[in-house]
Amino acid sequence: MGNHLTEMAPTTSFLPHFQALHVVVIGLDSAGKTSLLYRLKFKEFVQSIPTKGFNTEKIRVPLGGSRGITFQVWDVGGQEKLRPLWRSYTRRTDGLVFVVDAAEAERLEEAKVELHRISRASDNQGVPVLVLANKQDQPGALSAAEVEKRLAVRELATATLTHVQGCSAVDGLGLQPGLERLYEMILKRKKAARAGKKRR
């Protein structure tokens, strides 16, 4: 698990566009990004060490009665020295997942700054954002509504579709509905983009 970060952005060009959606998981260090990734992959809690580079996994998520949707998920390290490289990994992504530690309220202002910076980057404008308020299993964790308020999610660009979901990497709570909502937002954006092209 874990690879070194590079300036080269990941690409899904080797995959048919209908086969997998490219999603990047970012957030501050110790927010639980990698634990969430492997909870989705293996359906169990995996204790992880800080990601020094990135992890990537293909994850199939069941949606209703369909066969489900496949996400190619890139989990990128959140240490301060690695954050300038986030843009290389979010370029051309279908969706952003921003993970916060809801039990560590004192770092939410720092998380807010990073969320607004990455979502307003020229390459990411309009990209749907799912905020996962992780560690809901811990006492004192802030609710999704409180996290949404602290991060000023509604102040992101009006063209950016957003959703804040409480979750826990320990028991998997909230992950399925969160990813379903992300998928809906990605589809909505793609449909709007197609409609815009037809009007030209």
Swiss-Prot record:
Biological processes annotated in GO: intracellular protein transport; vesicle-mediated transport
Pfam families documented for this protein: Arf
Intracellular or extracellular location(s): Nucleus, Nucleolus; Cell membrane; Nucleus; Cytoplasm
MF terms (GO), sorted A to Z: GTP binding; GTPase activity
Lipidation (N-myristoyl glycine): G2
Major localization class: nucleus
Keywords on record: Cell membrane, Cytoplasm, GTP-binding, Lipoprotein, Membrane, Myristate, Nucleotide-binding, Nucleus
Transmembrane segments: none
SMART domains with a match to the protein in the record: ARF, RAB, SAR
GO cellular component, one term: nucleolus
Domain of life (superkingdom): Eukaryota
Protein residues bound to GTP: 27-34, 75-79, 134-137
Subunit structure: Interacts with CYTH2; the interaction is direct and ARL4D GTP-dependent. Does not interact with ARL4D.
Role description: Small GTP-binding protein which cycles between an inactive GDP-bound and an active GTP-bound form, and the rate of cycling is regulated by guanine nucleotide exchange factors (GEF) and GTPase-activating proteins (GAP). GTP-binding protein that does not act as an allosteric activator of the cholera toxin catalytic subunit. Recruits CYTH1, CYTH2, CYTH3 and CYTH4 to the plasma membrane in GDP-bound form.
Similarity-based family: Belongs to the small GTPase superfamily. Arf family.
Name of the featured protein: ADP-ribosylation factor-like protein 4D
Natural source organism: Bos taurus (Bovine)
